[in-house]
Swiss-Prot record:
Organism of origin: Neosartorya fischeri (strain ATCC 1020 / DSM 3700 / CBS 544.65 / FGSC A1164 / JCM 1740 / NRRL 181 / WB 181)
Source organism superkingdom: Eukaryota
Reaction catalysis annotation: ATP + H2O = ADP + phosphate + H(+)
Subcellular location: Nucleus
Gene for this chain: sub2
Matching SMART domains: DEXDc, HELICc
Protein name (database record): ATP-dependent RNA helicase sub2
Length: 441
């Protein structure tokens, strides 16, 4: 079997097939349920004392993390943990399984990065932590988060593996005991190929993490890869799963991988809104979109903007048009080579470009703190995709602005679905525009 056959690029593909057998309801987790405001906490292993924690901690020091981690946290400028971090970290470091759904930008990544680094006792030549996500860009970003927080842990080695790059380079890393990673981050296709080729050994894995887990477990082919990798790990390990959206249907599937997990749902169900993010729509015809976009980019103040379109072809065309109009734009989508995608991602993250035209490959998990404007040039197909997209402009409770173009009957149906799903009434964008002080931090 060729490696290319193993390496499916899941970035822009939605596989609609569902596995009916896998959606059988799992038994509910044991343990009490504690409802505090918009935060629901349940589960946790009953035999573990101290499995439950209030949300009154005021600093990362309260979690009793390693001193090296606390130094790195201070260097990053973090003072107070977010709500989801306060609830999850104290329990997760006790080796309890965690299923966490919290809206975009609330620091879910730091939960598993800090937890696994705190627990890790690195052994040369052994992989102890495995983190999987559905896109290469997100894998690259998670690897960078590990680098940030492990700066005072010199013995910890992290590597990222994803499709679109020569697999031989990955094999070279895994063939050398000096470079063999203690923490592996990657996409399921490439990781499964490395496991099948017996280049990556998972027999010492102690923590198994899925980020944006619903995206991976919803798609049947990706779920099979995840299951195959899961079976290659020891039975006695900690499992943690995170996402901004976890439907009632996907939760039992997640829990099939777990043992009595701590379940944390922040702003559950219809309350999945992004505080501080102003959301508007504009009704117009398809032919009016370019002129209106030009007007918005000319009139609005913003640090960085991300413009979402529905296809790679439209991304290229719009990017070309913007550059012809002297807007500093780049395009990121699955049609761009992997090396070029990472290069463009870094250009945008490092503020060398202010405008990014993207497909849904940038719709989940990507964290670029300067984005404060998101424009849906093409409305997404469903409400959850909308949440992930506009969430790029409201990270960690900061202010932001999102504007969606509505140009067809299908768009109007999606708009109604968004309003129904999140129990909000999206206002039409005012003719006189909006005051920049209301969305500029």
């Amino acid at each position: 079997m060729s490696h290319e056959e193993d390496l499916i690029d899941y970035s822009d593909e939605e596989l609609q097939t569902t596995d009916a057998a896998a959606t059988t309801a799992a038994p509910a987790a044991n343990g009490a349920q504690d409802k505090k405001g918009d935060l629901t906490v349940s589960g946790g292993r009953p035999d573990k004392k101290g499995s439950y924690v209030g949300i009154h901690s005021t600093g990362f020091r309260d979690f009793l993390l390693k001193g090296e981690l606390l130094r790195a946290i201070t260097d990053c400028g973090f003072e107070h943990p977010s709500e989801v971090q306060q609830v999850c970290i104290p329990t997760a470091i006790l080796n309890v399984d965690v299923l966490c759904q919290a809206k975009s930008g609330l620091g879910k990544t730091a939960v598993f990065v800090l937890t696994t680094l705190h627990q890790l006792e690195p052994v040369p030549g052994e992989c102890s932590v495995l983190v999987m996500c559905h896109t290469r860009e997100l894998a690259y970003q998670i690897k960078n988060e590990y680098a940030r927080f492990s700066k005072y842990l010199p013995d910890v080695k992290t590597a990222v593996f994803y499709g679109g790059t020569p697999i031989q380079k990955d094999i070279e890393v895994l063939s050398n005991k000096e470079s063999y990673p203690n923490i592996v981050v990657g996409t399921p296709g490439r990781l499964n190929a490395l496991v099948r080729e017996k280049k990556l050994s998972l027999r010492n894995v102690k923590a198994f993490v899925l980020d944006e887990c619903d995206k991976m477990l919803d798609q049947i082919d990706m779920r099979r890869d995840v299951q195959e990798i899961f079976r290659a790990t020891p039975a006695d390990k900690q499992v943690m799963m995170f996402s901004a959206t976890l439907s009632q249907e996907i939760r039992p599937i997640c829990k099939k991988f777990m043992r009595n997990p701590l379940e944390v749902y922040v702003d559950d169900d219809t309350k999945l809104t992004l505080h501080g993010l102003q959301q508007y729509y504009i009704k117009l015809s398809e032919s009016e979109k370019n002129r209106k976009l030009n007007e918005l980019l000319d009139s609005l103040e913003f640090n960085q903007v991300i413009i979402f379109v529905k296809s790679t072809l439209r991304a290229n065309e719009l990017d070309k048009l913007l550059r012809e109009c002297n807007f500093p734009s780049i395009a990121v989508h699955s049609g761009v080579s992997q090396e070029e995608r990472i290069k463009r991602y870094k250009e945008f993250k490092e503020f060398n470009k202010r405008i990014c035209v993207a497909t849904d490959v940038f719709g989940r998990g990507i964290d670029i703190e300067r984005i404060n404007l998101a424009i849906n040039y093409d409305l997404p197909a469903d409400a959850d995709s909308y949440l992930h997209r506009v969430g790029r402009a409201g990270r960690f409770g900061t202010k932001g602005l999102s504007i969606s173009f509505v140009s067809s009957e299908e768009d109007e149906k999606v708009l109604k679905e968004i309003e129904k799903r999140f129990e909000v009434a999206l206002p039409e964008y005012p003719e006189g525009g909006v005051d920049s002080s209301t969305y500029m931090a």
